[in-house]
Amino acid sequence: MFSKATLKERRQYYREEWSTKDMPDFILKDLKKREFGFDHNGKGPNDRYKVFRGSESLKKFLRYKAPFAAYISVAFYNNPRRREDWQKAEYIFDVDAKDIPIRSCQCDGVCEVCLGQALEIVNSLIDTLQDDLGLNNIHLVYSGRGYHIRILDEEMMTSGSELRSEVLKYVAGAEVPKSNFFNPDISNKSFNFEHFSIPVGYSKIFTDKLKYNIQHLVGNEELDEINPKLMKDIIKYRHHLDNDNWGYFKRDIGPRRYKNLTEAMARVNLSTIDAKVSIDLKRILRLPSSLHSKVSMKCMEVKNRETFDPLQEAVPKFVEERGE
């Protein structure tokens, strides 16, 4: 499993297994407003600016060409063939299992463990998008070696790159929450509240992600501002976090080193998501239902994110016939 598909296998997939029924409704209903791109030789999507008026013409193309990869734009255009008259674009969070900076599996590519970790991460992101931001037109797609969160709420679809960047930083936990609060009503005093003492809002988002990262450290990760001694102590004292005893953990790590830790993990949080994809208004993504030929997996919409298992649901028939 996870080996490259041959041309013969690609042809078999698109002629025997691929179906328009596997394409999500949110893709099908506006097919003619999107740009398509194709990679025919594994060197990137050089065949761009394609347009299909309906699913049948797309079906014929895929069966005839059996592309190495198929892509579709997140943007909607009145003239997609020229990428002109942009209307709006999906808001995307792209999490690739092989690019997660803290991976407990330590594998070289993708495996069952890091794919499971990627699903945990996107589930957490979706919960924040729904609970904190009130977004609800959200679709999850398994890309073949990670996940795409595709958001179609109108307020995000029509937003620009600046707002998308700010939302990304909030949802990802990409900044350390401020701890000093000034209250002019109480003798102009300043109060200090650590992020872990505020169990709501952004402080909770950051604390939850910080805890998740710390608990998944193996010990050999190379992270800015975390030297080997600090890494060793983080792992030594992280048992405090099993019961959310953050005060004890910070005490044993030390205030200055704890600051280094939180700043490093804020950067880790942001690097877990491909930020370029999130702010790009004209990005093309893998077409749900297409084949990810590098790893021989289906790119598909996830119907139930709590129970989805890519090794059971996204494996093409030709992989099973290999006997892998």
UniProtKB/Swiss-Prot annotation:
Known EC number: 2.7.7.-
Pfam family, one: DNA_primase_S
InterPro entries the UniProt entry points to: DNA_primase_S, DNA_primase_ssu_euk/arc, DNA_primase_ssu_PriS
GO biological process, one term: DNA replication, synthesis of primer
Keyword rRNA-binding: no
UniProt-listed SUPFAM superfamilies: Prim-pol domain (SSF56747)
HAMAP family membership: DNA_primase_sml_arc
Name of the featured protein: DNA primase small subunit PriS
Organism of provenance: Methanobrevibacter smithii (strain ATCC 35061 / DSM 861 / OCM 144 / PS)
